[in-house]
Amino acid sequence: MSTKVRKCKEQARVTFPAPEEEEDEGEDEGAEPQRRRRGWRGVNGGLEPRSAPSQREPHGYCPPPFSHGPDLSMEGSPSLRRMTVMREKGRRQAVRGPAFMFNDRGTSLTAEEERFLDAAEYGNIPVVRKMLEESKTLNVNCVDYMGQNALQLAVGNEHLEVTELLLKKENLARIGDALLLAISKGYVRIVEAILNHPGFAASKRLTLSPCEQELQDDDFYAYDEDGTRFSPDITPIILAAHCQKYEVVHMLLMKGARIERPHDYFCKCGDCMEKQRHDSFSHSRSRINAYKGLASPAYLSLSSEDPVLTALELSNELAKLANIEKEFKNDYRKLSMQCKDFVVGVLDLCRDSEEVEAILNGDLESAEPLEVHRHKASLSRVKLAIKYEVKKFVAHPNCQQQLLTIWYENLSGLREQTIAIKCLVVLVVALGLPFLAIGYWIAPCSRLGKILRSPFMKFVAHAASFIIFLGLLVFNASDRFEGITTLPNITVTDYPKQIFRVKTTQFTWTEMLIMVWVLGMMWSECKELWLEGPREYILQLWNVLDFGMLSIFIAAFTARFLAFLQATKAQQYVDSYVQESDLSEVTLPPEIQYFTYARDKWLPSDPQIISEGLYAIAVVLSFSRIAYILPANESFGPLQISLGRTVKDIFKFMVLFIMVFFAFMIGMFILYSYYLGAKVNAAFTTVEESFKTLFWSIFGLSEVTSVVLKYDHKFIENIGYVLYGIYNVTMVVVLLNMLIAMINSSYQEIEDDSDVEWKFARSKLWLSYFDDGKTLPPPFSLVPSPKSFVYFIMRIVNFPKCRRRRLQKDIEMGMGNSKSRLNLFTQSNSRVFESHSFNSILNQPTRYQQIMKRLIKRYVLKAQVDKENDEVNEGELKEIKQDISSLRYELLEDKSQATEELAILIHKLSEKLNPSMLRCE
């Protein structure tokens, strides 16, 4: 007994009323005894049961889930079938008292039944035992006017001994409802007693829902003849999971009970279609109740071999359902967050690096051996958490400490160095990058190779390579910083017979280096696309930005190359057919003459013009790519996250903005399209001018005179003033301020949780460098290293072994076909011996399973301790009062028996004394 319980017992002062005299057996059955009226009290115009000696429910009582009774008007409903069966069995629907609001017909209880229900409700163990043993006419299934029988009353008031006595009777009704009631109130010992009843010997009792049980039994889970106490889809294990009863969930799992995962929301099977057609609301509620049970920490802890993986997958599934079933969006979001909190809670209980690694990496012993060999720290759970955006799990100190250790792998001394030393290392790597690449090509497995393969060095190398690429972009335009010497209307050539376009389309050495860098980055993106798959690749916005940037670069250089080819062909024509040395004195064909023109005469669709435009866009995207590495810094990381969230808000705002903008643009164009040349300026006379005027009006760069006409058409002009004014008020005052408010709200959300957001973004950046590969940055990655050839040959050699290993795994999982088994078992004796040893290993729990079992045990113990700390004294005080009440009846029974024995002794003594007195007389 805990210290809190002892204190409660010391503080408890229970005053018991005087024992009531037993009523005469011949009492009028139609009259309601005063004793029965004291058992009930009026509440808000109705009646509410009052259990002596306290009315409060114990702390931790789980309110029943949403419940609705069946439609009695429906022909062939379970309630009508149940009532028919009860009439056939001769069960009498009695009521406790004259109030008939809860029953269609009222039948008064006999005095014996009144006394029996009283004893069961108040825990009078001696009376219940005596009536069950001696009475021949007692109906143990008699009910009060609320429809509760003796078992339900005893369970509701936590009378364990009375419940055990009642469970010994045959044909006892509503045992399932009593079990659900005991689970909801947290009466573990009563739950255990009910589960030991022969009625639960069949496992189907615990796996089928009450609505399915109604098709087989009359009232096993029923509260009364009108339906169940809880929702018809609530099974005992679902209710126990809802109420977070770990002991009860464990008992039910040992009995074979499981929560069936609902079908996919878009499932078209016959069962789902029938439920959706019959009652869509009930079907949706049943799905929510099932997911509440599946997402319960009690069920996740005790039912899954890998609770962390199960919780992560379930959180993602619930998040998707929140976006699908909008009407239950908040419910599904809470359940998804509950699963995420469970994972964080388990991670928080780790005590050493081995346990942290087990959670972050998953079960490495069940993974492919080649994958484990290639990288011991797979971090599969961290990758999954990042994919499902479980930010608190990734940003947890235990996870961050482990990631930081891997980040400085093979560079343990650098972790404790100052910022100045780290910056010096970055500078050295940037300057010596070509030499480091050569050293890695020659000796990839040397000390230098191991250092370059560390995530930090890979990050520094890639960042330095990209900085060099940006430097090339700037240097390529440095000759035009102070202006150009060749004006757009001037042509300059190296020799008289040279075509001007040949000079302008030639590639410089910086442009060639830029193209090499672009090819290297494109090769890296192709490898990443191959490894991750198209879907995972596109889901990462930085990959989309990289792909777009590189595509524009390639398009720009392609257009530039086409222009160079055309100019070269023109030059070849001139060299072959023109004899004069000065082209200005020669008449050339139009298609050749075009390439001698100055820039001001080029066509708008000229490939070189298109190339220059695309190149400018690609340069802008290249510099914006710097934001990718900003999360590595604690100061700039939150700013980059806020910028990304702001861009999302702008895209959302653009929908409303475009709608309003397009409406006024078309309206103003229709109004002024007839006045081309009759306005002060050309605003709104064409669609293009209308777009320009309204767009720059947002920034205050349009004039009010844009709506003024030269003619005296005041009506049109006034309408223009009104529409233009409404547009400015709507766009500038309303929508722009709304956008500012949205951006401010998003920034505040990031700022309030900046540490978690930054660590989550930094972890995503780190993980991109944790996997093997991408050691050398572009453009050095274009040259394959000797290690790549060795790995390629090893894959070819090990391909048959990998195939046999997959076949062995399929057979062990019961998935291999007969042909696969035949091919496998015809291998050498050594292979057979290895398979036998592998099977023997499978029979033993893996190291991961042992660690997970230890962590889950801590989690359950912590949950139970937290629950005990949260409980108030009222619940424990009521339990003490109930025990004292039962003890009172036992003492009264002992007193009654002692009185009877004393009366018998006095009678015997008087019989012996009377003859002696007569003889004396």
Curated annotation (Swiss-Prot):
Topological relation to the membrane, as annotated: Multi-pass membrane protein
Impact after mutating residue 525 to A: No effect on inhibition by Ca(2+) or thermostability. No effect on activation by diacylglycerol (DAG) analog
Catalytic activity: Ca(2+)(in) = Ca(2+)(out)
Record Gene3D superfamilies: 1.10.287.70, Ankyrin repeat-containing domain
UniProt-reported outcome of changing residue 874 to A: Retains robust Ca(2+) inhibition with moderate enhancement of thermostability in low-Ca(2+) conditions. No effect on activation by diacylglycerol (DAG) analog
Impact when changing residue 847 to H: In SCA41; no effect on localization to the cell membrane; toxic gain of function effect
Region (Disordered) location: 1-73
UniProt key word Membrane: yes
ANK repeat boundaries on the chain: 111-140, 146-175, 177-203, 232-261, 634-663
Effect noted on mutating residue 888 to C: Loss of inhibition by intracellular Ca(2+) and loss of Ca(2+)-induced thermostability
Side of membrane Extracellular, spans: 478-508, 563-606, 674-713
Illness: Spinocerebellar ataxia 41: A form of spinocerebellar ataxia, a clinically and genetically heterogeneous group of cerebellar disorders. Patients show progressive incoordination of gait and often poor coordination of hands, speech and eye movements, due to degeneration of the cerebellum with variable involvement of the brainstem and spinal cord.
Residue ranges that the UniProt entry lists as topological domain Cytoplasmic: 1-459, 528-540, 631-649, 740-921
Entry-linked SMART domains: ANK, TRP_2
Residue span of region Binds to IP3R3: 850-870
The keyword RNA-binding is assigned to this record: no
The protein's assembly and partners: Homotetramer. Interacts with ITPR1. Interacts with ITPR3. Interacts with MX1. Interacts with RNF24. Interacts with JPH2; the interaction is involved in maintaining Ca(2+) homeostasis in skeletal muscle and is mediated by JPH2 'Ser-165' phosphorylation.
Species of the source: Homo sapiens
The protein's name in its UniProt record: Short transient receptor potential channel 3
Tissue specificity: Expressed predominantly in brain and at much lower levels in ovary, colon, small intestine, lung, prostate, placenta and testis.
